[in-house]
Structures are given as C-alpha cells and as structure tokens.
Amino acid sequence: NGDGKFLDVSNIAGVDHAGYGTGISAGDYNNDGFIDLYLTNFGPNVLYRNNGDGTFSDVTTSAMVNRTDWSSGSSFGDYDNDGDLDLYVSSYCNFKINQHQKCYVTDILGQKKHVYCPGEQFSGTADTLYRNNGDGTFSDVTKESGVYNPIGRGMSPLWSDYDDDGDIDLFVANDATENFLYQNNGNGTFQNI
C-alpha cells in the first residue's frame, strides 16, 4: 500500500486457490512481459497466466500441466535454449489420505506416541519436466530427457549452469533420498551425475 503494509488481493487477482499449497514458482512462460505463477499442491497444481491487468487466469488444463499428485516444488528455466521457459515440477511421495499409515515413536517414558510418518515410509513418485512448446502449451518430456526417476521424493528444484558451459543444469533436493544433479547435455537430454 506504500505505507509498509500489504493488502490481500488474492481474490481480486483470481489466485485465491483453496488447495493445500506446498510451493510456487514465477516466470514469464508465454513471453508476454508479465510474470506468471505455477502453484504446487497436495492435489491439483495450478498454472496462473498473468493477464497484465492485475488479474490471473487458470490455464492449467489448456497448458497441459495438470498434475494431481503431491507436488512439492517447481522451477521455470529454459533448459533447451529456445527462448521460452520450460517447467520442472518435483513430486513428493505416493500418499493418499484414505491410505494413511500410522507411525509411532516411543518417548523417554516408554509410551508410544502417534507421529507424522517420515518420507521413507512412502514410495517416491517421479518428477516431471515440461518442455514449453512456444504456443501456450507444454509437453511432458520427462523420460526422453533423462530426468525420469520414480524414487525421488522431490522437494525443490533449481536451475543453474553449475558447469559454466552455457546451458542450465538442474539440481533437485529430495527428502529421504539422495539429491539429484542433472547435467544438461546440450541436446535436450540430461545425465544424473
């Protein structure tokens, strides 16, 4: 507001999603000069296209980035150097409310206490790499790009040119599983090093 305070305009802006949000990334995926948002959730993710007037439109289905599992993080980056932002979405684990496991620990008094189960109690799920088609849609290129790994329990992805060769590489932080460092081969594929 210009006075050191913020005003909640999520409803007016059209981003008042009622899901269980776990992460968000920002990037201009359609090259119109306005920053768009990708929201990851325990449940359906949402891609919000910035309309340039202070509002956003949900274009998740038309953009073909509608994951419905437990996604925990995402990151925009131009891995194929074609001038538009691609999208990597990390997925946490194969967890369903109706299949919830009960986990217990024994406290110092010898009593069993119910706790949230750690990540290793659940099988991991594969993350997804979406290539931007340049027309407002994306294609899932996870397997052919070499980043398919079903055991991940992905938390947070980050694009960076760690080897300084002119193309961005991908680091994925995981829970209860080793992290992934995918080196960009410069031809649309990656190698997990």
What residue ranges belong to the model's regions?
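Acidic, glycine/proline-rich Ca2+-coordinating loop motifs
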Residues: N1-I193
